[in-house]
Amino acid sequence: MAKKALIEKSNRKPKYAVRGYTRCQRCGRSRSVYRGFGLCRVCLRQMAHRGELPGVTKSSW
């Protein structure tokens, strides 16, 4: 889990647009966040395995 201060800091509008970054909506992780889902890879994988994300299926070949 991210520190509450870092989550609050990311919610503020940055002074310059390029300073903005995404955080996982579920756990607050700042790295490897999928924009389409708003989730990090860890949360995305957990939710996909439990079937909580409609249309996401496990790939097999």
Curated annotation (Swiss-Prot):
Protein name as it appears in the record: Small ribosomal subunit protein uS14
InterPro entries: Ribosomal_uS14, Ribosomal_uS14_bact, Ribosomal_uS14_CS, Ribosomal_uS14_sf
Record organism: Frankia casuarinae (strain DSM 45818 / CECT 9043 / HFP020203 / CcI3)
Record-linked PROSITE patterns: RIBOSOMAL_S14
Record-level GO cellular component terms: cytoplasm; small ribosomal subunit
UniProt subunit comment: Part of the 30S ribosomal subunit. Contacts proteins S3 and S10.
Function: Binds 16S rRNA, required for the assembly of 30S particles and may also be responsible for determining the conformation of the 16S rRNA at the A site.
Entry's family note: Belongs to the universal ribosomal protein uS14 family. Zinc-binding uS14 subfamily.
Gene it is expressed from: rpsZ
Family annotation (NCBIfam families): PRK08061.1
Note on cofactor: Binds 1 zinc ion per subunit.
Keyword presence, GTP-binding: no
Record keywords: Metal-binding, Ribonucleoprotein, Ribosomal protein, RNA-binding, rRNA-binding, Zinc
A Gene Ontology molecular function term of the record: rRNA binding
Reported cofactor(s): Zn(2+)
Residues where Zn(2+) binds: 24, 27, 40, 43
Record-linked Pfam families: Ribosomal_S14
Record GO biological process: translation
Keyword Ribosomal protein (UniProt): yes
